Amino acid sequence: MENRNKEVRRVLIEEGPIDEHRQRILRILGYLGGESAWNDLKQILKGNDQEARKAVLQSLGSWPNGAPLETLSDLIKSEKDSIIRAMALRAYTPLLSAPSYLSDEMKTESIKEIYEINSSRSDKRNLIGVLALLATEEALKFAESLAAKDDNLVASYGDLAYKRVSENLSKVFSVKEDLNVLKSSDALVFGEGSFAVDETDGSVKGWSNPQFYLVWPVNFPESGAYDISVNAATPSGGGGEFEVVLAGERGIARTANNNEYSDIAVGKFEVKEPGTYRVIISGITIDQKSGQLMNLRSVTLKSN
């Protein structure tokens, strides 16, 4: 990835393509991501070339981590050009909804602040959509205040967000010990058909689509590093790759080659600030078209 970014940057900086091609390259760089790429794009956003700034903003909503959030937030609050400001908000919202270094508490405060800034109804609706993903008491209070608005559309979105945040809060796990086990039966389960908790052993089964996923809202009272492993079995004809996400960090692992429950190490994850974050497990690939990824019983966070 970084090598591809270097080549794109070389063409952009050294060969100086004409404006139309330059804008296309800026958009490509925005989709690819990477620390060096972001440093270049950030300088463009701080500059005066309006067309180049727009080209960068068009792709930042798909950035692979939360690196652009602070810069985009500053643009939303202080940019004088209304088009640039609106584009920054439309890039900021999907990034805010994705896992990142920002805790749910920080995301809640950001949504409350930005919601009051003049923006379109669709932009406000999208912000409420992000609010519905969170698991904080402040998010619940803000959703409740939106549900009480005279604007019927805002009120309906606020009511939906209130219900979602209430459900999220009911699932919050608070880290207390060196060894913390998140049971699949306590997760928020997102999928279709038979993808659900099996009451006989408490595992989630029916993982027939790699896009299915589970979420645990977890409150970390302090910063720290954690080794994460999953306890799972591979059903006959199944198996594949999966991803674990926490606080914007990602780890990829493969299922075991047997149908017995066993622990699968994923990697070390760092929580840099106290707060509530989501542990997310999603599929990447399933080895056989008609197979199932795994039967997932639990996730373990071990402090180190």
Task: Show where each model-derived region lies.
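Amphipathic alpha-helical scaffolding segments comprising HEAT/armadillo-like alpha-solenoid repeats
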Residues: 2-15, 23, 34-46, 54, ...
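Extracytoplasmic
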Residues: 165-304
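Short inter-helical turns and helix N-cap capping residues of alpha-solenoid HEAT/ARM repeat scaffolds
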Residues: 17-18, 48-49, 80-81, 119-120, ...
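Specific register positions within alpha-helical solenoid repeats of the TPR/Sel1-like families, i.e.
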Residues: 93-97, 167
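Eukaryotic acidic, Ser/Thr-rich intrinsically disordered low-complexity regions
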Residues: 147, 151-170
